[in-house]
Curated annotation (Swiss-Prot):
One of its GO terms (biological process) is L-arginine biosynthetic process. It comes from the Eukaryota. InterPro entries: Arg_succ_lyase_C, Argininosuccinate_lyase, Fumarase/histidase_N, Fumarate_lyase_CS, Fumarate_lyase_fam, Fumarate_lyase_N, L-Aspartase-like. This is Argininosuccinate lyase. The active site is at 167 (proton acceptor), 288 (proton donor). Homotetramer. It comes from Candida albicans (Yeast). The record marks 301 as: Increases basicity of active site His. Belongs to the lyase 1 family. Argininosuccinate lyase subfamily. It is an enzyme of class 4 (lyase). Keywords: Amino-acid biosynthesis, Arginine biosynthesis, Lyase. Pathway: Amino-acid biosynthesis; L-arginine biosynthesis; L-arginine from L-ornithine and carbamoyl phosphate: step 3/3. HAMAP family: Arg_succ_lyase.
Length: 468
């Protein structure tokens, strides 16, 4: 037997009694999660505080012991908060570290009762749900602020017209506020989904033990209420092994980042010299180390780039859990790094996006100068529809007008003479020239969801009512 195998396992290991040989130091490092799960210190201490209240109700901890435990837990909380908590060898995870420190403060004869009937399986599941719930509530708050900033901008700049694009080609005139409302709609749907996920996250696994349930009949509903959960997970096997809430949180983060990526891509294009529709504030731009004239939209490019990072966290975690058997397996430890990274990335992304949209300036003149008369070709077709001509026929006629203007090298279809319109189709009348007005074009799109001023204002009010 090697010298390493002769060593006794660390006294700090919660599971050390079964083993006679020490673990490989690399295995200790490979197995440890404290470097990243220490962010859950507050959730872990809160969970233990309420759990010991449940043990006190059962008579397994005296009230005097409970008070000492709670005092010790609050001291540990303060140490973590002040960055004074000392991590020691054998602190495998946040649960081990906190329990070890509690023993140092109040003595192991009392701290040793804290884990009665509890497993790290239900403990970590509880910590995760508390941490994720609080993280998602924070995301909900700042996402609300982001959407509100978009809506306020849309109200303020409701009268600004710009080209709308399909295939990145000029399509039809729209209101700048309509574009803003479009993304506000995406983000409001994200906001609504987030509320649904928070409801599903907020279920308590505490009191499920390792897998089979609690041996002392602890009041799980009491524990759930004390921790702010809406209810309990009704099956102990599921309670310790369910990570659907992690997957949902990652999927939500992925979908949101997809939306923020598209939002950023549009703004990157609009900020380019070729478009010149918007200008980012200096606070959200950077320069070039070589070219003094450059003002780069790095904030938006990072928002776009970090979406791929979050997508990867989701796909990676799904691969980690796709084939694991029921109840708890160590694979589940791989839930934390991708989730914590994704939640932090999304939080920072929302804050950056809020700053960008709140501080950018628009160039109304450039937006309106980019409008071209060929964008009113559909309006020309609609003109004939109102004269009773079938749309498929009017579409063809309007296309002929566009082709004629190109052949004549005219700047737009509005430059065709009335006689030329009549040569193409005799049903054109002199009022056809009234078609070529961008403001009139957008105002004709007044159906629900359209780009007319009344329609956009209704969209903004609807979104505002959802948020309120």
């Amino acid at each position: 037997m090697s010298q390493q195998q002769d060593k006794q396992p660390s006294e700090n290991k919660l599971w050390g009694g079964r083993f006679t040989g020490a673990t490989d130091p690399l295995m200790d490092l490979y197995n440890a999660s404290l470097p990243y799960d220490k962010v859950m210190y507050d959730a872990d201490l809160t969970g233990t505080k309420v759990y010991t209240q449940g043990l006190n109700k059962l008579g397994l901890i005296t009230t005097e012991e409970l008070n000492l435990i709670h005092q010790g837990l609050e001291q540990i909380r303060q140490e973590w908060h002040d960055n004074k908590f000392i991590i020691k060898a054998g602190d495998e995870d946040i649960h081990t570290a906190n329990e070890r420190r509690l023993g140092e403060i109040i003595g192991k004869n009392i701290s040793g009762k804290v884990h009665t009937g509890r497993s790290r399986n239900d403990q970590v599941a509880t910590d995760m749900r508390i941490f994720v719930r609080e993280s998602l509530l924070n995301l909900s708050k700042i996402l609300h602020q982001f959407i509100t900033a978009i809506l306020e901008r849309a109200h303020k700049e409701i009268d600004v017209l710009m080209p709308g694009y399909t295939h990145l080609q000029k399509a039809q005139p729209i209101r700048w506020a309509h574009w803003l409302s479009s993304y506000a709609t995406y983000f409001t749907e994200d906001y609504k989904r987030l509320q649904e996920i928070i409801t599903r996250v907020n279920q308590s696994p505490l009191g499920s033990g390792a897998l089979a349930g609690h041996p002392y009949g602890i009041d799980r509903e009491f524990l759930a209420k004390g921790l702010g959960f809406d209810g309990v997970i009704g099956n102990s096997l599921t309670a310790v092994s369910d990570r659907d809430f992690v997957v949902e949180s990652l999927f939500w983060s992925t979908l949101f980042m997809n939306h923020i990526s598209r939002f950023s891509e549009d703004l990157i294009i609009y900020s380019s010299g070729e478009f010149g529709f918007i200008k980012l504030a200096d606070a959200y731009s950077t320069g070039s180390s070589l070219m003094p004239q450059k003002k780069n939209p790095d904030s938006l490019e990072l928002l776009r780039g970090k979406s791929g990072r979050v997508f990867g966290q989701l796909s990676g975690f799904l691969m980690s859990i796709k084939s694991i058997p029921s109840t708890y397996n160590k694979d589940m430890q791989e839930d934390k790094e991708p989730l914590f990274d994704a939640l932090t990335t999304v939080e920072h992304s929302i804050l950056i996006a809020t700053g960008v949209i709140s501080t950018l300036s628009i160039d109304k003149q450039n937006m309106e100068k980019a409008l071209t008369m060929d964008m009113l070709a559909t309006d020309l077709a609609d003109y004939l529809v109102r004269k009773g001509v079938p749309f498929r026929e009017t579409h063809h006629i309007s296309g002929e007008c566009v082709r004629k203007a190109e052949e004549e090298k005219l700047s737009g279809i509005d430059q065709l003479s009335f006689e030329q319109f009549q040569q193409i189709d005799s049903r054109f009348e002199k009022d056809v020239m009234e078609t070529f007005d961008f403001e009139a074009s957008v105002e004709r799109r007044d159906a629900l969801g359209g780009t007319a001023k009344s329609a956009v204002l209704k969209q903004l009010e609807n979104l505002k009512s959802i948020l309120s």
